[in-house]
């Protein structure tokens, strides 16, 4: 196998072989466009609009009331008419304890939770895009392997045909060579279909017309080990911090609600005799201490629950990061070993066996076995690279690698 063929395969493993896919796409571009095309942004904006409207209502004082009352209406002559009373009162409830600010604080905390949740949802979109991108890269690399296999099978079929014509090999050798060529072409068709299907799924996620995308050039076989210090994604911690602020705001609201509100009222009273009086009143409800303590205790328990959930989540995420990093390292070693040792050896073996076969030193079966060994080595290399990049997808999600791409501009 010429060394240039191996170099071309490794340098362009991500390149699409079909001219139908005309628009190159990098992973960063794919993530940016998928997030922009997702209706998740409109849904999150609607949720925020709802909460902003709720906040406006929460930041208002209680509604004033106006009451009109007529008393002593009846039948009894002028003496009774002089006892008619018409009273108009204006009533206002005076909130105490900072209830208004506490209500607004709860809604502000809800808004923070929604924003943190929105960022997590956008990061999940990025993860879905990255997973599809890896699938498309693997499919493109498989196409390259299949194309190389077809090229080798064609050369071998011609060589065997010449030997059969010269009566140096039996007829079945030519039949077997043609069968292997047909099998290689079928595998190429299947690989191209899988590649096109992966790109179609990518186009659907991006909201693009199918048939206009191709994965940008890169090296699918380049692998790297994770860095030593990896921490959970800040966005995953941020939502717990937002929930913590929400629990603290709810506690302040319940503490403020423990103070009863003062209600004042006043107004004129018109008497049937022609006299005018002024009425005024003050109302102060008695505290329900048991209910207040219960509400405060519930809010405190919710705050403790958020802290406990955060501790559990961080514990689990650190374990998941360690496992994902180990998988990335393990698969990177496998890719490097197969790429740098197994595949070159299989290429040299096939080249040497073919040279010996042309000199009459080997049989067609020897060449066929060497060809199969090379194909299996390359396929194993692509499978290992696929597992490596899939493990990288999980690790990137846990560490929030693409947060900067999915954040909304401020």
What does each model-found stretch correspond to?
Residues 121-233, 324-327, 331:
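Periplasmic alpha-helical coiled-coil/stalk elements that build and connect Gram-negative outer-membrane
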């Amino acid at each position: 196998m010429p060394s240039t063929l191996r170099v071309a395969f490794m340098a362009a493993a991500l390149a699409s072989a079909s001219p139908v896919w005309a628009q190159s796409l990098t992973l960063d571009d794919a993530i940016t466009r998928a997030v922009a095309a997702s209706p998740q942004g409109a849904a999150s904006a609607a949720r925020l609009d709802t909460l902003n409207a709720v906040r406006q209502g929460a930041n208002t004082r209680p509604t004033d009331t106006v009451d009109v009352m007529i008393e002593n209406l009846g039948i009894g002559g002028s003496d009774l008419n002089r006892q008619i009373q018409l009273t108009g009162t204006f009533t206002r409830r005076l909130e105490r304890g900072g209830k208004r600010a506490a209500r607004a604080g709860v809604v502000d905390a809800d808004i923070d939770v929604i924003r943190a949740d929105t960022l997590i949802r956008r990061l999940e979109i990025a993860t879905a895009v990255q997973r599809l991108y890896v699938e498309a890269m693997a499919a493109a690399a498989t196409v390259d392997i299949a194309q190389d296999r077809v090229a080798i099978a064609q050369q071998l079929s011609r060589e065997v045909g010449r030997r059969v014509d010269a009566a140096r090999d039996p007829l079945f050798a030519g039949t077997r060579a043609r069968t292997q060529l047909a099998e290689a072409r079928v595998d190429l068709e299947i690989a191209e279909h899988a590649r096109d299907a992966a790109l179609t799924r990518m186009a659907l996620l991006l909201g693009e017309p199918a048939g206009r995308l191709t994965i940008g050039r890169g090296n699918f076989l380049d692998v790297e080990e994770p860095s030593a210090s990896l921490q959970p994604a800040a966005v995953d911690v941020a939502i717990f911090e937002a929930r913590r602020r929400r629990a603290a705001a709810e506690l302040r609201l319940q503490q403020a609600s423990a103070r009863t509100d003062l209600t004042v009222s006043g107004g004129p009273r018109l008497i049937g005799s022609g006299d005018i009086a002024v009425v005024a009143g003050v109302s102060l409800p008695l505290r329900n201490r048991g209910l207040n303590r219960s509400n405060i205790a519930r809010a405190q328990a919710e705050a403790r629950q958020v802290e406990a959930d955060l501790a559990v989540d961080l514990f689990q995420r650190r374990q998941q990061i360690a496992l994902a990093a180990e998988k990335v390292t393990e698969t990177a070693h496998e890719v490097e070993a197969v790429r740098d040792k197994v595949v070159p050896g299989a290429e040299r073996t096939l080249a040497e066996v073919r040279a010996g076969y042309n000199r009459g030193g080997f049989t067609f079966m020897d060449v066929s076995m060497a060809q199969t060994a090379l194909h299996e080595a390359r396929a194993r290399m692509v499978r290992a690279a696929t597992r490596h990049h899939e493990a990288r997808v999980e690790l990137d999600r846990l560490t929030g690698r693409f947060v900067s791409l999915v954040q909304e501009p401020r």
